[in-house]
């Protein structure tokens, strides 16, 4: 068997499925949420089925946290793999109550608070299911059914949770209701999750790492922010390009309702309610909300102007330049994207390697309660 370093999930899946050729290799941390993203039909769900053992491609490899589920001499069947699987449509037992659905398939016996065990009461709290326990599935909304399906998967005590576009069958309002619950799961549980979606807003809200696919191939693997800011990949050149990264709350100004966030390479002021110092927050800054200046701006309504250095540039269409910025005077901090016109580029005499000020006109602050837009 081929051993790899622990705390990683490694997949090498190759083969033909009818007219579709899959050649997908990746290695991601066995912690947090890894997004599996790409256009419809690129092979995302097929990779998930390979991880689950529902699809057998001979000669492939599947290693989860040091346990080999598939290699040249091994193939564990789906029931032998400690996985939880959440599908696009919640498949609940209609003749059972919500509570009975939740405990169906859970390991028998009392775990007694054993390390790593996900407790029933914890799942009920995290997913907001207490008032639903005695209901029948037919009396639940689409979002409630999906929350029950997620809870049932968690209570099976999986080593890996697979989620195949779990929000795709829901309308936007229902998606917005469920996303905060998924964020809470992410914050409270150490269980690794592979999350399939073709909706970039879900990936930006939830994922720590990303597997980017196109036409059956993996074209990028790594931390979400790294792939978002790589001009060689499609996320950076998209019209709605943005970068997500972690921030730490430092102070709150109750007089102005402004939260000071420390990021790698600078500080940001964001309109917000009170937040405890040290709390971690996730922020999103769109390329279209970043403008550049050669000197520190004065007398402006824009709250945030960060020292940065131009790391790289590339043309986007005939009129614009995509600029990758590194925060901090040396450019060693977090990466940002900016889109500037070619005219502005020439007039400001911008070039790779020079120091600039990145004026951030808008910051999306994600929290357990959702996303609030902070502008100017």
UniProtKB/Swiss-Prot annotation:
Keywords: ATP-binding, Cell inner membrane, Cell membrane, Membrane, Molybdenum, Nucleotide-binding, Translocase, Transport. Its EC number is 7.3.2.5. PROSITE patterns: ABC_TRANSPORTER_1 (PS00211), ABC_TRANSPORTER_2 (PS50893), MODC (PS51241), MOP (PS51866). Its main location: membrane. One of its GO terms (cellular component) is plasma membrane. It catalyses: molybdate(out) + ATP + H2O = molybdate(in) + ADP + phosphate + H(+). InterPro entries: AAA+_ATPase, ABC_transporter-like_ATP-bd, ABC_transporter-like_CS, Mo/tungstate-bd_C_term_dom, ModC_ABC_ATP-bd, Molybdenum_import_ModC, Mop_domain, P-loop_NTPase. It is found in: Cell inner membrane. GO terms for molecular function: ABC-type molybdate transporter activity; ATP binding; ATP hydrolysis activity. Residues 1-240 form the ABC transporter domain. The complex is composed of two ATP-binding proteins (ModC), two transmembrane proteins (ModB) and a solute-binding protein (ModA). Belongs to the ABC transporter superfamily. Molybdate importer (TC 3.A.1.8) family. NCBIfam families: modC_ABC. This is Molybdenum import ATP-binding protein ModC. It comes from Rhodopseudomonas palustris (strain BisB5).
């Amino acid at each position: 068997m081929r051993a790899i370093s622990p705390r990683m999930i490694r997949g090498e899946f190759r083969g033909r499925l009818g007219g579709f050729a899959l050649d997908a290799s990746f290695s991601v941390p066995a912690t947090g949420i890894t997004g599996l993203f790409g256009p419809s039909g690129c092979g995302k769900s097929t990779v998930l089925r390979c991880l689950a053992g529902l699809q057998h491609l001979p000669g492939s490899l599947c290693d989860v946290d040091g346990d080999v589920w598939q290699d040249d001499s091994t193939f564990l069947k789906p029931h032998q793999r400690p996985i939880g699987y959440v599908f696009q449509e919640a498949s609940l037992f209609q003749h059972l109550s919500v509570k009975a659905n939740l405990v169906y398939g859970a390991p028998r016996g009392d775990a007694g608070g054993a390390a790593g065990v996900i407790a029933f009461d914890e799942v009920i709290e995290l997913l907001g299911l207490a008032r639903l326990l005695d209901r029948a599935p037919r009396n639940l909304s689409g979002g409630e059914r999906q929350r029950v399906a997620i809870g049932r998967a968690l209570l099976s005590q999986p080593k890996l949770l697979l989620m195949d576009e779990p929000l795709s069958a829901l309308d936007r309002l229902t998606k917005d209701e469920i996303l905060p619950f998924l964020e809470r799961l992410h914050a409270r549980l150490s269980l690794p999750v592979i999350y399939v979606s073709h909706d970039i807003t879900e990936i930006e809200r939830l994922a720590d790492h990303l597997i980017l696919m196109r036409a059956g191939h993996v074209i990028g693997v790594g931390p979400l922010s790294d792939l978002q800011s790589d001009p060689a990949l499609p996320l950076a050149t998209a019209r709605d390009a943005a970068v997500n990264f972690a921030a730490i709350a430092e102070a709150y100004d109750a007089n102005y309702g402004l939260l000071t966030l420390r990021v790698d390479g600078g500080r940001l002021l964001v309109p917000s309610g009170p937040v405890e110092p040290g709390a971690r927050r996730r922020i999103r800054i769109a390329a279209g909300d970043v403008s550049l200046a050669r000197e520190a701006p004065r007398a402006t309504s824009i709250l945030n102007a960060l020292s940065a250095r131009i790391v790289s540039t590339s043309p986007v269409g005939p009129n614009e330049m995509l600029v990758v910025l590194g925060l901090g005077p040396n450019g060693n901090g977090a990466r940002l994207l900016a889109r500037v016109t070619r005219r502005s580029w020439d007039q400001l005499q911008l070039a790779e390697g020079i120091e600039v000020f990145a004026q951030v006109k808008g910051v999306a602050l994600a929290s357990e309660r959702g996303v609030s837009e902070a502008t100017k």
